[in-house]
């Protein structure tokens, strides 16, 4: 097999959808027995253990959790697609599988904006 340069790999990744890229990352993690999120989790855990007083400060990253779609499921699916760039099937599966996170680790203002949009479409949403 020919060896690919870093630029060639990046060009190939640019052509993938987010779902395809996510599947690639999962396979990569399984094949090489690694976790893409490990360095971030270790750094966050070390920071939290070193300064427990800072934990009382306001949280800076939020997860937007869709609790239920309510009566207007189609409108909620449209909003989920707009917020996440998911395809129709993926957005429908996310809405049908509620409660599920729509957005993870986003800034407070982005989380509140997403919550307002989803609630405007008829969904029940919580921020964590």
From Swiss-Prot:
Keywords: Ribonucleoprotein, Ribosomal protein. It comes from Kineococcus radiotolerans (strain ATCC BAA-149 / DSM 14245 / SRS30216). Gene3D superfamilies: 3.30.1390.10, Single helix bin. Belongs to the bacterial ribosomal protein bL12 family. One of its GO terms (cellular component) is cytosolic large ribosomal subunit. HAMAP family: Ribosomal_bL12. Forms part of the ribosomal stalk which helps the ribosome interact with GTP-bound translation factors. Is thus essential for accurate translation. This is Large ribosomal subunit protein bL12. GO terms for molecular function: mRNA binding; structural constituent of ribosome. Homodimer. Part of the ribosomal stalk of the 50S ribosomal subunit. Forms a multimeric L10(L12)X complex, where L10 forms an elongated spine to which 2 to 4 L12 dimers bind in a sequential fashion. Binds GTP-bound translation factors. CDD domains: Ribosomal_L7_L12 (cd00387). The keyword Iron does not apply. InterPro entries: Ribosomal_bL12, Ribosomal_bL12_C, Ribosomal_bL12_C/ClpS-like, Ribosomal_bL12_oligo, Ribosomal_bL12_oligo_N_sf. One of its GO terms (biological process) is translation.
């Amino acid at each position: 097999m020919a060896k690919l340069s870093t630029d060639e790999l990046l060009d190939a990744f640019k052509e993938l959808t987010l779902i395809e890229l996510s599947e690639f990352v999962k396979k990569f993690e399984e094949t090489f027995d690694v976790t893409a999120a490990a360095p971030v989790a270790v750094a966050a855990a070390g920071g939290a253990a070193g300064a427990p007083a800072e934990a009382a400060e306001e949280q800076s990253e939020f997860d937007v959790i869709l609790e239920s779609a309510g009566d207007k499921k189609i409108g909620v699916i449209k909003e989920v697609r707009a917020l996440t760039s998911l395809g129709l099937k993926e957005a429908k599966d996310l809405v049908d599988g509620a409660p599920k996170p729509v957005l993870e680790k986003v800034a407070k203002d982005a989380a509140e904006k997403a919550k307002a949009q989803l609630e405007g479409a008829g969904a029940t949403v919580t921020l964590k």
